Amino acid sequence: MAGNSIGQLFRVTTFGESHGIALGCIVDGVPPNMALSEADIQPDLDRRKPGTSRYTTARREADEIQILSGVFEGKTTGTSIGLIIKNADQRSKDYGDIMDKFRPGHADYTYQQKYGIRDYRGGGRSSARETAMRVAAGAIAKKYLRERFGIEIRGYLSQIGEVKIDPQTVADVTKINWQQVADNPFFCPDKSAVEKFDELIRKLKKEGNSIGAKLTVVAENVPVGLGEPVFDRLDAELAHALMGINAVKAVEIGDGFDVVAQKGTEHRDEMTPAGFLSNHAGGILGGISNGQPIIATIALKPTSSITIPGRTVDINNKPVELITKGRHDPCVGIRAVPIAEAMVAIILLDHLLRFKAQCK
């Protein structure tokens, strides 16, 4: 299983399983002499961790980060930073019934077929629990980008099921009310949509069902020049990183799929001496950042861990009916906002370091 690392100069490698002893990661390429402590990382983990609201899984994990290496007297040394989070609230007994059954819509079947063995407890390595370490590494990247280059990376939830926010609240990404986003459990910039999200999630929890979501990440103050054509284009690398998040089924940069209905006269981002007149491209042209806000949107599927019976097969390919036990999110998109922010931060810092190494 070789796909556990991302990045070239800023490189993140994660390890651990949902019901294992701990989760961890190694972060390579962090420049030296940056002030860093657990307090710089913990806030983003608190935004992602389970059990923080009635809209997410009831599993309770403190997700307390511990720095093992790479920091001396409060500053990064330029060596590998080791991070670890101890698991505490596993209930592996909830998964005894699926030891020999494949949960439909999950990675159980494909992991078993590929490796001939799998950790069935909460999905093991395929669980979104692993993303806690991506958020931890991303927090380091966000801090460096913010302090050294003024780059801000923030995300918001725009849709749950059929309920959408008012598009006017995000029409100009430079004027999004980020305090409103921070002040509600849905990371929602539209105050009027919060109540509708609340009603929908409550209804789904009563039904034992789940729903999908859409969220957007905005990176502001990104300099011109990030991205390595042709195969390491910035948009391609962002799409790769974001598609690697559990449950993500689609990625859009800028206007994304809406470009199909646009004409060239509408889509082209015309320029004047004062700058661009629009940002349909989402801040990237020819695979290189153009200095405008980078806008990336992802769609997440509804989790298949629901209490409504469903048909599947066991390891002997015999038909069985399955009810998923355990504690699960009715909408995984809610807690995915800090995860998506982290992945964008990891890619941007990696490309910024690559840009500095080659161009300036």
From Swiss-Prot:
E.C. designation(s)? 4.2.3.5
What does the entry list as the binding residues for NADP(+)?
48, 54
Question: Is this entry keyworded Disulfide bond?
Answer: no
Output the GO biological process annotations, alphabetical, semicolon-separated: amino acid biosynthetic process; aromatic amino acid family biosynthetic process; chorismate biosynthetic process
Q: What does the Swiss-Prot or TrEMBL cofactor note state?
A: Reduced FMN (FMNH(2)).
Which annotated residues bind FMN? 125-127, 246-247, 286, 301-305, 327
Record's protein name: Chorismate synthase
Q: Which organism is it from?
A: Actinobacillus succinogenes (strain ATCC 55618 / DSM 22257 / CCUG 43843 / 130Z)
